[in-house]
Design a protein with these regions (language model features):
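Low-complexity or membrane-interfacial segments used for flexible interactions
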Residues: 2-107, 184-312
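Short N-terminal edge-element motif at the start of the domain
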Residues: 94-175
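One face of beta-strands
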Residues: 150-152, 165, 177-179, 211-213, ...
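Short strand-coil-strand connectors
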Residues: 155-157, 182-186
Length: 312
């Protein structure tokens, strides 16, 4: 900043002043007049404050980042599934192991085991793989008959200050294979993906995706006019491809294992709820796999009955 300094000599005279009141005029004095030059933005030594639009755009960016699916936990579910050509008998009650997946994509040690005690029952329970006592983290109970959806029960001994909770896995409708779960953590839905979603998953996985199940968190938000709008956020996906499905199973196998990817960022600072969400995702994913096996067995039974009755 440059300044211009001038020296001025000033003499004051009083107009119409009474000489008796002011006997002597005031003395002459000198003053400096300083003219400030215009400050250019480039010459300022301080950083200017950010514009409002910059702050607003940054806020939008941070909000949209949470809507992008980013897996914070990956698990490999190993299950042989049910082949296309076989008798519609109940599968063997072999335990389903769920393994941790490292940051490099390598499979680590087992984290959970889903145990089905009896072959003629679909009910099962989930335990820690290293728990010799096999204390259930949650149990899934299947009931026979229409209008009786399976229930997942989160056991109260797993989490501090938490009562047991029963969660129904309800079908969304007759013409869809999607299911809905209403919990204290929110409302969640398992559904089968669209072709566009499979192509997007193929880009991230690096190979063709045979089957993709998506776990959505469903929320109701208020909009203008006093109405409510449904919003969805993907919190999980179950990917089955040539490299991720259980070894020995095929593309046409029903209920085979694959890679479960979970986005648990919303619950990172709430340890108990994060663990509850992880267990719920694993148990409900295994339930979706069983649903595929039941569907395959039903189709096989219908085919056998049609052939025995001499159908067209």
């Amino acid at each position: 900043m440059s300044t211009k300094v001038e020296t001025m000599s000033t003499s004051l005279s009083y107009l119409n002043s009474d000489s008796s009141t002011y006997s002597n005029p005031p003395p002459e004095y000198e003053a400096e007049a300083i003219e400030l030059s215009r400050i250019s933005p480039a010459s300022s030594s301080t950083n200017s404050l950010p514009e409002y639009t910059t702050l607003y755009n940054n806020n939008i960016t941070s909000t949209s980042d949470t809507e992008v699916f980013y897996p914070t936990k990956q698990l490999q579910i190993q299950a042989p599934g049910f082949p296309l050509i076989s008798l519609p008998l109940p599968p063997q009650p072999d335990p389903i192991y769920i393994f941790n997946v490292g940051s490099t994509g390598d499979i680590d040690e087992a984290e959970y085991v889903s145990i089905r005690p009896a072959r003629n029952s679909g009910s099962c329970f989930l335990v820690r793989a290293n728990d010799q006592v096999q204390k259930p983290l949650c149990t899934t109970t299947y009931r026979f008959g229409p209008g009786k959806p399976p229930k997942i029960r989160l056991e109260n001994g797993t989490f501090q200050n938490r009562q047991s909770e029963e969660i129904e896995i309800s079908c969304k409708g007759v013409f869809t294979r999607g299911v809905v779960m209403r919990t204290h953590l929110g409302t969640f839905e398992w559904r089968y993906s669209s072709r566009a979603e499979r192509r997007a998953a193929q880009t991230s996985v690096g190979e063709e995706v045979d089957c993709l199940l998506i776990l959505d968190q469903v929320m109701k938000v208020a909009v203008a006019g006093g109405k409510q709008e449904e919003r969805r956020r993907k919190v999980g996906q179950f990917v089955r491809s040539n490299g991720l499905r259980t070894p020995g199973s095929r593309k046409c196998t029903a209920g085979n294992g694959g890679r479960l990817m979970l986005d648990l960022r919303e619950w990172l600072d709430r340890k108990d709820e994060r663990l509850e969400m992880e267990i719920l995702a694993v148990a409900s994913c295994v339930s979706m796999m069983k649903k595929e096996v039941d569907r395959r067995r039903m189709h096989q039974t219908m085919a056998i009955m049609g052939g025995a009755s001499g159908g067209p």
